Curated annotation (Swiss-Prot):
GO terms for biological process: L-histidine biosynthetic process. The keyword Oxidoreductase does not apply. The keyword Transferase applies. Disulfide bonds: none annotated. Its EC number is 2.6.1.9. PANTHER family: HISTIDINOL-PHOSPHATE AMINOTRANSFERASE, HISTIDINOL-PHOSPHATE AMINOTRANSFERASE-RELATED. This is Histidinol-phosphate aminotransferase. Its cofactor is pyridoxal 5'-phosphate. It comes from Rhodococcus jostii (strain RHA1). GO terms for molecular function: histidinol-phosphate transaminase activity; pyridoxal phosphate binding.
């Protein structure tokens, strides 16, 4: 069916009475293309094991018997399992009362800004960072205050605390490891941010399992009225299709989110599948070590070729410096390799994939380096 045959297609978004702060904005979205090598969305490339697939299938089958009933609106069993996982992974003795879950960490962040942001309030982030933070701020009518990182993309804590003191944001985002640069933020640095912040600090730990840095969870009892740690099962857990995000914080934060969450927001199917995935955490997370090893190998190969490689604690690598990053992105795509243009001039981001995928990426990079690097980036 052509556009002319689609009912209502004669108008565009600009013809709608949309909020002014959304007018002219672009929606979030990474290209979804069918190519031989997909390294653009930071998924775990290792598929679920047969045991996990079977467990999910059986768990969903059992849950389907109750599809005529609403799910547990507070997802108590799932939150209990998530708390147990966090205890094992971080050593911090959190309980079900410290944990909240939603449909991906983006919904977690949205609920937090619904409760603690909104009209007349502001949120600060240290850019470049996760591009959904300002989008969620716009969606909740929270003023977005971007503060730039250092030239090496690390967090400048002195500049961060000075900006917090000057602007006094209601919400501060700290992403560790940071997407798209890969840097982790140490506990001492987080303390300085928390001490300076007048409102809440959301530490986005979507890629925490890939990093050896201590989790911010260790600070919850020290900063109970300020600290929220958000996480996801989409990355290391290889559960991106399951859409499950969660947070850990003082119980009072969970009580606050109950005021803004939609009723029965997590389906019985999502809860059952996520609990099954958590039962297989050890086997799934075994791939993290392999991906970290591949990250080192790929980073060295890029460096040897002449790229500037930003050190990463995550499952992706930011690298450059390209004369034209958009043109370089297309050059990779022409070679069957899909990576991500994250909007940083001169740089692209590649997910660490399977060894064979990384080999194809390295071959493409060797070819592209000859024509796409700046003279400062080409050190070969």
């Amino acid at each position: 069916m052509t556009a002319a045959n689609v009912p209502g297609s004669s108008i565009g978004v600009d013809a709608l009475p949309i909020r002014e702060n959304l007018r002219g904005k672009s929606a979030y979205g990474a290209p979804q293309l069918t190519v031989p090598v997909q390294l653009n969305t930071n998924e775990n490339p290792h598929p679920p094991t047969k045991a996990l697939v079977d467990d999910v299938a059986e768990s969903v089958r059992e849950a389907a018997r109750e599809l005529h009933r609403y799910p547990d609106r507070d997802a108590v069993a799932l939150r209990t399992d998530l708390a147990a996982y966090l205890v094992r992974q971080t050593g911090v003795p959190v309980t079900v009362d410290n944990v909240w879950a939603a449909n991906g960490s983006n919904e977690i962040l949205q609920q937090l800004l619904q409760a603690f942001g909104g009209p007349g309030r502001s949120a600060m982030g240290f850019v470049p960072s996760y591009s959904m933070h300002p989008i969620i701020a716009d969606g909740t009518e929270t003023e977005w205050l971007p503060i730039f990182r250092r030239a090496d993309f690390a967090l400048d804590v002195d500049a961060a605390t000075a900006a917090i003191t000057e602007r006094r944001p209601d919400v501060v985002f700290v992403t560790s490891p940071n997407n798209p640069t890969g840097h982790s933020v140490g506990i001492a640095e987080l303390r300085r941010v928390l001490d300076a912040a007048p409102g809440i600090v959301i530490v986005d730990e979507a890629y925490a399992e890939f990093s050896d840095a201590p989790s911010a969870l260790t600070l919850i009892d020290e900063y109970p009225s300020k600290l929220v740690v958000s996480r996801t099962m989409s990355k290391a857990f290889a559960f991106a299709g399951g859409r499950l995000g969660y947070l850990a914080a003082a119980p009072a934060f969970i009580e606050a989110l109950l005021l803004v969450r939609l009723p029965y927001h997590l389906s019985v199917v999502t809860q059952a599948a996520a609990r099954a995935a958590l039962r297989h955490a050890n086997e799934t997370l075994a791939s993290v070590h392999a991906l970290a090893t591949e990250r080192v190998r790929v980073s060295k190969a890029l460096d040897d070729t002449g790229f500037r490689v930003i050190p990463s604690d995550a499952n992706f690598i930011l690298f450059g410096e390209f004369t034209d990053s958009a043109h370089a992105w297309r050059a990779y795509l022409d070679r069957g390799v899909l990576i991500r243009d994250v909007g940083i001039p001169g740089y692209l981001r590649a997910t660490v994939g399977l060894a064979s995928e990384n080999d194809a990426f390295i071959v493409a990079s060797d070819e592209i380096a000859a024509t796409e690097l700046t003279s400062s980036g080409d050190r070969g």
